UniProtKB/Swiss-Prot annotation:
Protein name, UniProt field: ATP synthase subunit alpha
Keywords: ATP synthesis, ATP-binding, Cell membrane, CF(1), Hydrogen ion transport, Ion transport, Membrane, Nucleotide-binding, Translocase, Transport
Domain of life: Bacteria
Family the UniProt entry places it in: Belongs to the ATPase alpha/beta chains family.
Annotated site, Required for activity, chain positions: S373
Listed GO MF terms: ADP binding; ATP binding; proton-transporting ATP synthase activity, rotational mechanism
Its biological purpose: Produces ATP from ADP in the presence of a proton gradient across the membrane. The alpha chain is a regulatory subunit.
Length: 512
């Protein structure tokens, strides 16, 4: 069979039309050094700061140093098997973590992979770990409370949804306990919680998970873990990953609470990475951008407007405002709040809860110092009944602490001073609270009403705890409707005042 030139030409054209060229270009380079989780790469061009770099065995590094001829990157995980001369390439993407409702009740690592031994997690998408904070126009004022369940905090240092409130104090003063109790108190409120453990011992993290399970609060919580045994790169990344997970709920018009435990260890991990990258050290050997490290993280916590939620969901969700409330924790050394990292975070946040070792050791739990603890925006969000009943508590405590210091130098005190000291001691005793026992708004209101209206005058200090426990039981048994009404509305009026007086009078007459 002979083909003529026309048929040959047609056949060649068909083959050319069907020919597919599998041609793909990569921005590729090679590793020139590996040490302590830091790799130096030569040959990469057009690299973005924070870009993911693909390593052999489908592992990744993040570009943190971009120099004239080389790129410095930090490996996300083990680096033992990485060798010099290995080929790497740019991905053109920044790091993203999986997010979704299915992460609630689970323990994940800084990259969003489950580490609790349960099934894999079906995610609802991916969010970038580094994201811009909402602008001024997109924000809404903080005017809704978030209840911690602690009398001393909800009455004197109230926290609002969308606020950033620092918990600061020496080691072993109850910082984590306060944060965990706040999570436990949210199980009825519908607020989604994220607990980020940075540089903690695994035994401590296991204990936190166990306590949340025991108090039926784990179902509402995501735990992000970068333990002390993990690479500094993962400890650096963990808070940003946790914040991305919180932003998923905020963007749906829901309220979320995120706890960073703690940012001191986060700063140390970043210092380690920066020194290994040969960045110039500054004060306390921290790099120059240590303030920006925490400010860009904490500025993402805010309350956003309905328009923002509507815009970000492309009109799928309307009429809802979302929020991220951040409770960063900072550990001080011997009560020194003027150190570099504590002063940075104090200046970024909207207030601080200061926990003192001497108060903790003297049996006052939570060991909050009301004198230097402050909430800059939370008072606007405080429940009406708590706001009205707590106005005199801070003043009474401040006067008591001043007089207590003065009375050490004088044995001869007049009756007025003695009464003030006695009243202050009783209020201090009344504000004590055990761990894992948060109380409701109505219970707080009743206790504050007792303190504010001098119903403790005829009760000795050693019986205050018993009095508090029994009056709350009495209130739930005989005034259940009143307590439920206060929990729902948070209002305070003459009717509620009269019922409180009747309740306390009846209890003291018949039961105590």
């Amino acid at each position: 069979m002979r083909l003529n030139s026309t048929e040959i030409s047609k056949l060649i054209k068909e083959r050319i039309a069907q020919f597919e060229v599998f041609n793909q270009s990569y921005n590729e380079g090679s590793i020139i050094s590996v040490s302590d989780g830091i790799i130096k790469i030569n040959g990469l061009s057009n690299v973005m700061l924070g870009e993911m770099i693909l390593l052999p065995n489908n592992e990744y590094a993040i570009a943190l140093n971009i120099e004239r001829d080389t790129v410095g990157a930090v490996v996300m995980g083990p680096y033992i098997h990485i060798s010099e001369g290995a080929k790497v390439r740019c991905t053109g993407k920044i790091l993203e973590v999986p997010v979704g409702d299915n992460f609630l009740g689970r323990v994940v690592n800084a990259l969003g992979f489950p580490i609790d031994g349960k099934d894999s997690i079906q995610n609802d998408g991916f969010f970038p770990v580094e994201a811009d904070a909402p602008g001024v126009i997109d924000r809404k004022s903080v005017n809704q409370p978030i209840q911690t369940g602690y009398k001393v905090i909800d009455s004197m240092i109230p926290i609002g949804r969308g606020q950033r409130e620092l918990i600061i104090g020496d080691r072993q003063t109850g910082k984590t306990a306060l944060a965990i109790d706040t999570i436990i108190n949210q199980k009825q409120s519908g607020i989604k919680c994220i607990y980020v453990a940075i540089g903690q011992k695994l035994s401590t993290i296991i204990n936190v998970v166990k306590k949340l399970e025991e108090n039926n609060a784990l179902f509402n919580t995501i735990i992000v873990v970068a333990s002390a045994s993990e690479a500094a790169s993962l400890q650096y990344l963990a808070p940003y990953s946790g914040c991305a997970m919180a932003e998923f709920f905020r963007n749906k018009g829901e309220d979320s609470l995120i706890i960073y435990d703690d940012l001191s260890k986060h700063a140390v991990a970043y210092r380690q990475i920066s020194l290994l990258l040969r960045r110039p050290p500054g004060r306390e050997a921290f790099p120059g951008d240590i303030f920006y490290l925490h400010s860009r993280l904490l500025e993402r916590a805010s309350r956003v407007s309905m328009e923002y939620v509507q815009k970000i969901t492309k009109n799928k969700i309307t009429g809802k405002t979302g929020s991220i409330t951040a409770l960063p924790i900072i550990e001080t050394q011997s009560g020194d709040v003027s150190a570099f990292v504590p002063t940075n975070v104090i200046s970024i946040t909207d207030g601080q809860i200061f926990l003192e070792s001497n108060l903790f050791n003297s049996g006052i739990r939570p060991a909050v110092n009301p004198g230097i603890s402050v909430s800059r925006v939370g008072s606007a969000a405080q429940t009406t009944i708590i706001k009205k009943l707590s106005s005199g508590i801070r003043t009474a405590l401040a006067q008591y602490q001043e007089l207590a210091a003065f009375s050490q130098f004088s044995s001869d005190l007049d009756d007025t001073t003695r009464k003030q000291l006695n009243h202050g001691q009783k209020i201090t005793e009344l504000l004590k609270q055990k761990q894992y026992s948060p109380i409701s708004i109505a219970e707080q209101a009743l206790i504050l009403f007792v303190a504010e209206n001098n119903f403790l005058d005829d009760i000795s200090i050693d019986k205050i705890t018993k009095f508090e426990k029994e009056i709350l039981i009495y209130a739930h048994n005989y005034y259940f409707d009143l307590m439920e009404e206060i929990n729902k509305t948070g209002d305070f009026n003459i009717v509620i005042k009269d019922k409180f007086i009747k309740l306390i009078t009846e209890f003291k007459k018949n039961q105590f």
